[in-house]
């Protein structure tokens, strides 16, 4: 046997033993035998690097570190699921489904508490692995995913498709990681989910390999790649070709059986070797999934039931007040630090005066804390039988804790507000919002630096940011030359932002990012917008009377007029530079059309096509309905194309779309 033949044999043996151990949980050889063969292959590849391949079992131990993760568009968006928190929510979901498609069965699966990933295979070889990211674009973590032994590097059949699943850290691996961190004096990981996410984002895959991650696969981008007619059949076929799926799933005939499954796992979840945070319920029949379709954010045929949040008792030591950019006074509970759902909680929002009175929350009380949606800490209730003697009902102040101005409560609102336009806290919060990523996107201006600039009287409003001098900034603590130069470059770059970013950055009450875009596109310039009336504004889709009145009042304020003049004087762009209504009129093919993309696109990515069509005024949706104007079908388009044909909706090829875009 020559060296090439031995390498091939080692590949086959190691892949087989790996599958038996990590997927089937039924090893046929001891660990020592596997390790012996693996080290033999490592030695051969070290001496003959030309024999090392991308699917070699040795990639399981990690490879050369990378400097950063590449951003890659998903071929099909990785949508999140809608959430249910009660039986009532699930019954409402069941009714919506049955109203549209009649009786259904549900495939019910454990919701693994990990990190969603997609795995791409070409001719049966694993070639790319991405994080969910924002659902449209993920990070390429292929090398790190290759260290997860349950992910097959090659399949038994030469399929070209994308499979999705949840990478996670087993509890045993999590305990081992924290034991090691404690030993070497490093901070402990908060919970297995955070540890798994951090492990998969290590730039050195050798570190990822040491974390002993695992994975369950739960879906294929196009389930017909497996010739499956249902979710249950698709999962069985994933098992057959070498993937690891979760076998605690169950096919339920009705919601009563779903409730039984939820009740069982609510009680038994702690017996598992991994964390789960809920149950996923999916319509089993794929044809009915297609019929139900999607919303912009999630499939209509699936929902995630979230387990009730863990509740713990701690002491409320104080109530701290903060002032937001619109003057709203928000009370925050300062708690005796306590572990809740894996992380330490020391603060929780009390929202407003009414909530404090309704729950009779007092300083010194023992309170029940939980995380809403297992994310945001909240005070659930007071433990009255533990209330210390001498506590007094908490009263919100009558004057602003920042500027001393009288606080007011506007009719119809629950919040107390400081209406002093010169309030220090409001001005600082306004600047923080102005520089944020979704507004003017001035990188390097964090909350601490903004507060220093304001307290040192270097800035008094957002316009002063454009007068910052290098020499003055260098005198500030922790502001070195590189940091200052980077900050000044970011400020200069922000001058060219399109009008919608400036509008949103100004923090106008009731005006969000979407409305800012609508107004910028509609009016084109700040001058045009200044001349708008409430009547003209309310004629625009998505602009209500409250928003219109707030905008007109804001732009007529003398201080704001002066502020905008200063910003323009300092070179800040006051025009909309994106695609305008006039541009849309130049593209009558796609302007104001509802378009559905389906199948595999090969010339453009799905996100590129969506962006191009949207910029020309099209509305891109996921479901084919009577309101759809055009269906653009790539290869393997499936049921959406069939539905378009049945409704008489024009079906275009990808090339036809590209030709129209070019023209």
UniProtKB/Swiss-Prot annotation:
Keywords from the named record: DNA damage, DNA repair, DNA replication, Ligase, Magnesium, Manganese, Metal-binding, NAD, Zinc
Keyword DNA damage: yes
Active site: 111 (n6-amp-lysine intermediate)
An example Gene Ontology molecular-function term: DNA ligase (NAD+) activity
Residues the entry annotates as binding NAD(+): 31-35, 80-81, 109, 132, 166, 282, 306
Pfam families reported for this sequence: BRCT, DNA_ligase_aden, DNA_ligase_OB, DNA_ligase_ZBD, HHH_2, HHH_5
Gene Ontology biological process terms, A to Z: DNA repair; DNA replication
Protein name: DNA ligase
């Amino acid at each position: 046997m020559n060296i090439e033949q031995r390498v091939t044999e080692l590949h086959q043996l190691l892949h087989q033993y790996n599958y038996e151990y990590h997927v089937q949980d039924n090893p046929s050889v001891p660990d020592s035998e596997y390790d012996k063969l693996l080290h033999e292959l490592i030695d051969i590849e070290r001496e003959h690097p030309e024999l090392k391949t991308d699917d070699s079992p040795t990639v399981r131990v990690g490879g050369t570190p990378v400097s950063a993760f590449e951003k890659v568009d998903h071929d099909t968006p990785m949508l999140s699921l809608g959430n249910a928190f009660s039986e009532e929510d699930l019954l409402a979901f069941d009714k919506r489904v049955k109203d549209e498609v009649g009786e259904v069965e549900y495939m019910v699966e454990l919701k693994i508490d990990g990190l969603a990933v997609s795995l791409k295979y070409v001719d049966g070889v694993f070639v790319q692995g991405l994080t969910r990211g924002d659902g449209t674009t993920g990070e390429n973590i292929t090398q790190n995913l290759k260290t997860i032994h349950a992910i097959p590097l090659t399949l038994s059949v030469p399929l070209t498709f994308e499979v999705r699943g949840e990478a996670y850290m087993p509890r045993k691996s999590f305990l081992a990681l924290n034991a090691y961190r404690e030993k070497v004096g490093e901070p402990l990981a908060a919970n297995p989910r955070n540890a798994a996410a951090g492990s998969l984002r290590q730039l050195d895959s050798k570190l990822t390999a040491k974390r002993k991650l695992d994975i369950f696969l739960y879906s294929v981008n196009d389930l017909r790649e497996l010739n499956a007619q249902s979710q249950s059949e698709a999962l069985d076929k994933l098992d057959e070709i070498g993937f690891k799926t979760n076998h605690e799933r169950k096919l339920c005939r009705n919601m009563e059986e779903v409730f039984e499954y939820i009740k069982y796992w609510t009680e038994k979840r702690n017996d598992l070797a991994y964390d789960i945070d809920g149950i996923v319920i999916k319509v089993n029949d794929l044809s009915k999934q297609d019929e139900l379709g999607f919303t912009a954010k999630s499939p209509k045929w699936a929902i995630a039931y979230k387990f009730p949040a863990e509740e713990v008792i701690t002491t409320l030591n104080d109530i701290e007040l903060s002032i937001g950019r619109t003057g709203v006074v928000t009370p925050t509970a300062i708690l005796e630090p306590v572990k809740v759902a894996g992380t330490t909680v020391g603060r929780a929002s009390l929202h407003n005066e009414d909530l404090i009175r309704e729950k009779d929350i007092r300083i010194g009380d023992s309170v029940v804390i939980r995380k809403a949606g297992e994310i945001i800490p909240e005070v659930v209730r007071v433990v009255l039988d533990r209330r210390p003697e001498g506590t007094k009902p908490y009263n919100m102040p009558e004057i602003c804790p920042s500027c001393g101005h009288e606080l007011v409560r506007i009719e119809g609102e629950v919040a107390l507000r400081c209406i002093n336009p010169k309030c220090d806290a409001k001005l600082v919060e306004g600047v923080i919002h102005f520089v944020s990523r979704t507004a003017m996107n001035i990188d390097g201006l964090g909350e601490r630096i903004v507060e220093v600039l304001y307290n040192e009287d270097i800035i008094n409003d957002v316009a002063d940011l454009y007068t910052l001098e290098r020499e003055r900034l260098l005198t500030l603590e922790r502001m070195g030359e590189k940091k200052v130069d980077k900050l000044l470059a970011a400020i200069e770059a922000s001058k060219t932002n399109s009008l919608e970013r400036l509008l949103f950055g100004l923090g106008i009450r009731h005006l969000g990012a979407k409305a800012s875009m609508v107004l910028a596109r509609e009016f084109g310039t700040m001058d045009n917008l200044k001349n708008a009336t409430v009547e003209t504004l309310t004629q625009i889709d998505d602009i209500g009377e409250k928003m219109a009145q707030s905008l007109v009042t804001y732009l007529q304020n003398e201080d704001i007029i002066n502020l905008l003049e200063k910003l323009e004087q300092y070179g800040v762009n006051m025009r909309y530079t994106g695609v305008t209504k006039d541009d849309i009129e130049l593209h009558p093919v796609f302007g104001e059309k509802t378009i559905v993309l389906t199948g595999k696109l090969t010339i453009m990515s799905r996100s590129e096509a969506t962006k191009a069509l949207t910029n020309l005024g099209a509305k891109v949706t996921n479901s084919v309905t009577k309101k759809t104007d055009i269906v653009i079908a790539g290869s393997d388009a499936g049921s959406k194309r069939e539905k378009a044909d049945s409704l008489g909706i024009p079906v275009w090829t990808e090339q036809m779309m590209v030709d129209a875009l070019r023209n």
